[in-house]
Swiss-Prot record:
Transmembrane segments: none annotated. Residues 26-92, 384-412 are annotated as: Disordered. It is a lipid-anchor. A lipid is attached at residue 21 (S-diacylglycerol cysteine). It is found in: Cell outer membrane; Cell surface. GO terms for cellular component: cell outer membrane; cell surface. Moraxella acquires iron by extracting it from serum transferrin (TF) in its human host. Acts as a transferrin receptor and is required for transferrin utilization. Keywords: Cell outer membrane, Lipoprotein, Membrane, Palmitate, Signal, Virulence. It holds the Pfam family TbpB_C. This is Transferrin-binding protein B. Residues 1-20 form the signal peptide. Belongs to the TbpB family.
Amino acid sequence: MKHIPLTTLCVAISAVLLTACGGSGGSNPPAPTPIPNASGSGNTGNTGNAGGTDNTANAGNTGGASSGTGSANTPEPKYQDVPTDKNEKEQVSPIQEPAMGYGMALSKINLHNRQDTPLDEKNIITLDGKKQVAEGKKSPLPFSLDVENKLLDGYIAKMDKADKNAIRRRIESENKAKPLSEAELAEKIKEAVRKSYEFQQVMTSLENKIFHSNDGTTKATTRDLQYVDYGYYLANDANYLTVKTDKPKLWNSGPVGGVFYNGSTTAKELPTQDAVKYKGHWDFMTDVANKGNRFSEVKGTRQAGWWYGASSKDEYNRLLTDEKNKPDGYNGEYGHSSEFTVNFKEKKLTGGLFSNLQDSHKQKVTKTKRYDIDANIHGNRFRGSAIASDKEKDSETKHPFTSDAKDRLEGGFYGPKGEELAGKFLTDDNKLFGVFGAKQESKADKTEAILDAYALGAFNKNDANTFTPFTKKQLDNFGNAKKLVLGSTVINLVSTDATKNEFTEDKPKSATNKAGETLMVNDKVSVKTYGYGRNFEYLKFGELSVGGSHSVFLQGERTATTGDKAVPTEGKAKYLGNWVGYITGTGTGKSFNEAQDIADFDIDFKNKTVNGKLTTKGRTDPVFNITGEISGNGWTGKASTAKADAGGYNIDSNGTNKSIVIRDADVTGGFYGPNATEMGGSFTHNTNDSKASVVFGTKRQEEVKP
């Protein structure tokens, strides 16, 4: 990846950016151990200096070497980070890499040469995540824009030449001052045709030729999931969607579209029970081979599986799909159903994918298993296999469900508490691509936080709006603090020995992916993480910018509440680290872009209390005092500027007496990694007089004995 230095954040006079990087001695970052206590404020000790550049490893504490806790001669305690287990993840094959979703376009045979065309893993499309839309509206499905574009291409190919030339001349005339290239001209012609009344009429006529698995017309095609879209999206129009060219020699016929799953809101909490039931549906598409009437049991038309891939829709003529056709007293499933049992204690997922076959004469419904699902849970994702239930040789001419997908299945839990799941698989012989989705049958009794991932808006420039200033926005994450997930854009946050680690992702060349889906991130992404000698393994935090929209962010893997590496329930601990924030006040402001500032916390696990302060280099009084109460593997509390009752925090030490007052901002925090060796949190504040977005991260300390 090409690394480009981040542009220094330009802050208006009304803003304060506090980049807190604890553990530094003056302007030079110290060795990570040992580190003096950042508080250092004794009752009778000397105030001392704020940590000069030659005071190695003294992070600007309020007392010098003689500032003890009760006597000027009491040496100040020194600390070092408690060793942290390496956060090493299992290597994952490309077919099982996590994503917000995946899809594959319906396969076609070239009718000129009629060569068998197996499915190809390389043609699986990484999707960007289900789009959140206004209440009462539907999220656009993957392949819907792709279908429109293919229809548009077919329409333009059949347009009268004189009509196309007229559009061309008009666009050229409108751009005389700055002539367009042929590529630019072609794109403008395409968009002009797209907006034309004539093409919109064609689009309207296509509505009754579009089929998707959540159209709500039958029980089989009603998928009432909130966080996941999945299934097929297909359109069939012989007039405009049949492609025939001489260069290259190509002839495709049949529907266009694809099969997919697409999720939003990756789970941050999961149930703790050993048997949570999920139910839903599944869908599939097959390869193509030069053989008519290929699957006798799956044949919407004889071309399915021959000219184009057969899909789950092609088996509907043999299934119970509609409630009006159910036998008397029937209370079973419809269409292609899926069922899963999840043991969250043992981190196992098992299930089955079924075809609910209906005898057209007796009306009897037979629930026929097509695949057994077996997977292991990793964070909020699962990986495993789909094993075909019917591998008999003579079944290959009846249906395509005869081959396994061993270690070629992946999926994840969606919804804040894992209310839904979805996944995909590709069989070993590249014959069938399947997707599935399901939701909990009943609400789980108890859940536990497994991770945090969020951004706190700071400020926006140039009409950018990815983040709302001083508002928390949940980010997606696949259970790995070292990977920042922004739709289909994933950035590896690999630590180095550098004081700051910077990462960038350039603006994508296209605003859409191969499924025609609009990308969530259409601008340059810039990330800074902070450590200053501390190698955070399970917690990452810092600055995150998408174009001109700026934020601070935090993500971490929560400590378990049970087991030998759980959050302690006895004893006390010191935590030291860093913080980064953005603060504004009425008529005052100051930029601290390169400040080396300290987050200092005392945790009492037995009494479940949190006491901390966020300090800035060269100042004796804290910027924020924080108190909180522990619950499970997290905590909540309040943050206030020091001396709030006396007029607030004097932001300018030069004597201008301009202050910011923040009282009782709500703080949320968590413990991360084995045995709670890392801890972090955040808060926002938004009033007319003062605003703040702050994140902090710390590591547990052990005292260094003389």
